[in-house]
């Protein structure tokens, strides 16, 4: 028989550090829309609701730096500073807002995503 009680939690000696050793940035986000917008932890932040106004180029390849399964809500007319962290793994993004469909680090994918974002009013001409 084991000395472990069913359901017992045995914590590690040190706290788990999420998103360690990944590139990070911060952006100020304003919800210019007329209703709240909520963004989940693993959504490619560059492709969030076009009513959210922020520096999208700096958010390319990034997601919210928050625990998995959580989200941040942006209320209409309000500004909020958020921390972003680089998407990990193979860094392939498909779907979401339909702006990026491929390898995040490929120059062609990035330039096409910026063009799509400008054409769909996600970001201003730059």
Curated annotation (Swiss-Prot):
The keyword DNA-binding does not apply. GO terms for biological process: urea catabolic process. It comes from the Archaea. Its main location: cytoplasm. One of its GO terms (cellular component) is urease complex. Pathway: Nitrogen metabolism; urea degradation; CO(2) and NH(3) from urea (urease route): step 1/1. It is an enzyme of class 3 (hydrolase). Keywords: Cytoplasm, Hydrolase. Pfam families: Urease_beta. It is found in: Cytoplasm. Its EC number is 3.5.1.5. The keyword Lyase does not apply. InterPro entries: Urease_beta-like (IPR002019), Urease_betasu_sf (IPR036461), Urease_subunit (IPR050069). It catalyses: urea + 2 H2O + H(+) = hydrogencarbonate + 2 NH4(+). GO terms for molecular function: urease activity. PANTHER family: UREASE (PTHR33569:SF1). NCBIfam families: PRK13203.1, urease_beta. Belongs to the urease beta subunit family. Heterotrimer of UreA (gamma), UreB (beta) and UreC (alpha) subunits. Three heterotrimers associate to form the active enzyme. This is Urease subunit beta.
